Amino acid sequence: MMTYEYILVRYGEMTTKGKNRSKFVSTLKDNVKFKLKKFPNIKIDATHDRMYIQLNGEDHEAVSERLKDVFGIHKFNLAMKVPSELEDIKKGALAAFLQVKGDVKTFKITVHRSYKHFPMRTMELLPEIGGHILENTEDITVDVHNPDVNVRVEIRSGYSYIMCDERMGAGGLPVGVGGKVMVLLSGGIDSPVAAYLTMKRGVSVEAVHFHSPPFTSERAKQKVIDLAQELTKYCKRVTLHLVPFTEVQKTINKEIPSSYSMTVMRRMMMRITERIAEERNALAITTGESLGQVASQTLDSMHTINEVTNYPVIRPLITMDKLEIIKIAEEIGTYDISIRPYEDCCTVFTPASPATKPKREKANRFEAKYDFTTLIDEAVANKETVVLQTVEVVAEEEKFEELF
């Protein structure tokens, strides 16, 4: 019985790139190789327009499950490779059609002749291939407008690809082509989604989390580590910086009027994150803010908070409502972790009536009454850094270390 031997990957948005497309293709190939490390027999050939993954006996379903999380892939097809002879093409098309799962009642044939010297024209091939499928199946009909299955045939010199099973990729651009940002990872629903969407634009992420023991627990800290771990499904690794924030928050609570404590806290977070970004050669800061969702996410608040950093602040969720954000969180696997009932530092010393239209002048005046410089320096110096990778990579490295 014929089985799938190849996976053909289509790039999507990458095809709009010009002279630097080779960089995008090379990065995508590198990311795919990393993602498929546990499949040693696979061979990958990345061309200007498409990527060919030769399975060499590896499980196509297991490989497909990994590919769907790689940014830069628009779609991919499971494919069979047959000689460019009519009878071989007909047999291959039938074999591919019979492997399609689900309730299939209709199909159509699509033929692309890259090899123009093939002795039959496209309009001659369609009834030959389609007729062979009809002769060898029951209760199946042709529907050229809305078929259950599209049997794609690509004819080349010497060989042809047969494809039925088309699957969606993650879209976007390959992680690593767009520089690096620092993501403020709070432990809530929003910030992991912001990190995911930032990676989708080809940007590598490192995460900064502020924790305030004993007001926040070790379980809250572990929750954020688990979120960062979940995000490694979409990249090679996530570096997480855990910043001790207790003294900063206690001082804010003591020195700053309660209505401005939330605003000043966010400004301190920005200052500390900018310092870490400088150390780590990041080019921007990403947050999970959604316009108007809470008091610190009004336009006035963002305007006042932004004052303290020269870095671009990326807000991927800015126009989304909560239900849209939750939907993405559920799809990417972070929602169930985010709703664990452990407090983060943003809920510590929460003011009863935070200012929704804070002014820069007032924030600067309140901050001028106390020198926060030393506290900021200590927070940066005492951060804990954890590098997280996919579970399979960690297991592979541990297995390697056991050999020595």
From Swiss-Prot:
Major location category of this protein: cytoplasm
A GO-annotated cellular component: cytosol
Disulfide topology: none
Gene3D superfamilies per UniProt: 3.30.2130.30, HUPs
Domain THUMP residue range list: 61-166
One Pfam assignment: ThiI
An example Gene Ontology biological process: thiamine biosynthetic process
Keyword Cell wall biogenesis/degradation: no
Entry EC no(s): 2.8.1.4
Nucleotide-binding as UniProt keyword: yes
Listed name of the protein: Probable tRNA sulfurtransferase
Gene coding for it: thiI
